[in-house]
Amino acid sequence: MASSSPILLMIIFSMWLLISHSESTDYLIGDSHNSWKVPLPSRRAFARWASAHEFTVGDTILFEYDNETESVHEVNEHDYIMCHTNGEHVEHHDGNTKVVLDKIGVYHFISGTKRHCKMGLKLAVVVQNKHDLVLPPLITMPMPPSPSPSPNSSGNKGGAAGLGFIMWLGVSLVMMMFLI
């Protein structure tokens, strides 16, 4: 019975590692409060913001805005490009819109005011599956040196998820050694 306590502790620890690295992330649009408004720093401000993040299924994006002057419309790609605010769209007018990214693909959001959308108040978010992890090969061949990558200001969630999986795998292997 004494040997089952360490095994139980390892199982609990490995489950904690797995769960803690698979949680979703909440993103505040523009990384600041009340940023869904005009004027924008540039017409491509939200495009740059979105490209600096890696969105996965289950993540949430939060639009904070003045609901007396703004709204958020979820639209298709054509209406996104043309800034069409009329039609079959999901419209949000609450000033604190939370959207769960529940499927893989591209989500398109525009301001409910066409003039604001034309000024750049629109956002396209590419969502990937968080379970698309690439496992490293068991045997690696030396790679020729490559140029240094440019610095990246945002973190990479995929690396954290991969690290969590590798840690879980290592703990599982240690547990198996105790069971055999």
Swiss-Prot record:
Tissue/organ expression: Expressed in developing nodules upon symbiosis with Sinorhizobium meliloti.
Record: glycosylation sites: N67, N152
GO biological processes: nodulation
Disulfide bridge map: C83-C117
Localization (cell): Symbiosome; Cell membrane
GO molecular function: electron transfer activity
Keyword Zinc found: no
Job description of the protein: May act as a carbohydrate transporter.
Name listed for the protein in its UniProt record: Early nodulin-16
